[in-house]
């Protein structure tokens, strides 16, 4: 969003040189405010970030918030989601709705969403078969795009190390995503399951938004092993599904 300066009629009557100087001065001032807000978020000072955001919005300086949100997403900051969450629960829902991409609002409002793996355009689902531990293997669905099988909901907690954590239960089975405790010795990957309980860090996840081409995408990281992000396996079964959701070590 571009910064727009609105002048009163008496100001418009002055020379063009003075008008340009005033605009440049105000733009410079706003740039300093942007840096202050960005740094507050980056250092995890969310209370200050929320206060600043509410103040700027009340002063008609929403472009500051918009620019900061854009920069956070472009930079792939992990603190973006917690800043959004703090606004959402801190009288700033209108700011989230106005300046954050639409998918942030869906997540914060606790709506059911689809988790789509961009490379293969497959939606995350749980398999129909229960193992002896009453858990289901997670898959990338090769056909389904609109059923309860691929609907997930986020529940937010304020986590450690300034992270927003999520336990996403699926609508169809009401199970949570769980990271396996077993690591493949060759690939260092772990399988993802659906489980009935969410009482350990292996069922807690957080989102890291990023900008890719013209899309806003999210890496999904597990809390227990924070360098691990979700990915789909390479093997495709007869149904067109990818053989389970695995995790890749992100360096």
Curated annotation (Swiss-Prot):
It comes from the Eukaryota. Pfam families: Lipoprotein_11. Residues 1-16 form the signal peptide. The lineage of its organism: Eukaryota, Metazoa, Ecdysozoa, Arthropoda, Hexapoda. Coiled coil: none annotated. Its main location: secreted. The keyword Signal applies. InterPro entries: Lipoprotein_11, Lipoprotein_11_N. This is Low molecular mass lipoprotein PBMHPC-21. It is found in: Secreted. Belongs to the 30 kDa lipoprotein family. GO terms for cellular component: extracellular region.
